[in-house]
Amino acid sequence: QMDLQNMQIRAAFPHNEIGTDPSAIKAYAQGVEALGISHLLIYDHVLGADPDREGGFRGPYDKDVAFHEPLTTFAFIAGVTEKLEMITTVMILPQRQTVLVAKQAAQVALLSNNRFRLGVGVGWNQVEYTGLNETFNNRGRRQAEQVEVMRKLWNEDSIDYTGEYHRIDKASINPRPSKPIPVWFGGSAPALLDRTARLGDGWIPLMGANEKAQACLDHMKAKREEAGLSFDGFGIQSQAQYAGGDADRWVKHAKAWQNMGCTHLAVATHNAGETNVDGHLKRIEEYQRALQE
């Protein structure tokens, strides 16, 4: 029997099922904390597209799927919890203004006493980029520069920066976080893996514990070694689904990921039939129990 005790369990905020009542969101966050869950994940989509459009719309989410804005929701959750950590999974960084995200993330880090991590991705939905007035086709290249700019803003009181996509003319944000905000990257494109190895504090795979995931990890380890960066302390967050699972499947999945060096396992409890806050908490508890037995 492998020891799954060291694997930190995170929970995915049930974005489309929690509703809009702040007392329900508070009860959920406090319930997750009471279960001893290490982190809460919040997904990010700013706009939902109307599928009734020329050429149709292919994508997992449309205008009828609710997404709570992660940074403002985490600021609220920070105020009603004490230990629960938080990670955006993943914020679509290139469709947002870099300096503003740096400012907001710093604020959440301060309000939560450094319980916040920024998970970032590049997204896939052109409708959101258009609505947010950001360029879609250079989003990967911009993301790398965005992270560099944010780290400068978090650390320095005056920046004179000219990049390919950013110009900061002797300015910075205030207040700044008292500790570095960890940045984790989601995705598996080769350029993204290079970026994660070079700039990331962790990786968020969007796949199963398979050969492709192992190849991604090997690639990042090699890249970090080349750059003289340690792989110790580099986090890996995979995700399990409550829906369609049972104790055996969850344990098998967790062990497969643990064998690959995964540090954090997040469980998503939505899309498993209608339920309420208590129901979501019971699902998390059931998943936890399966891994502890």
Predicted regions and their residues:
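Active-site-adjacent structural elements that line small-molecule/cofactor binding pockets in enzymes
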Residues: 1-293
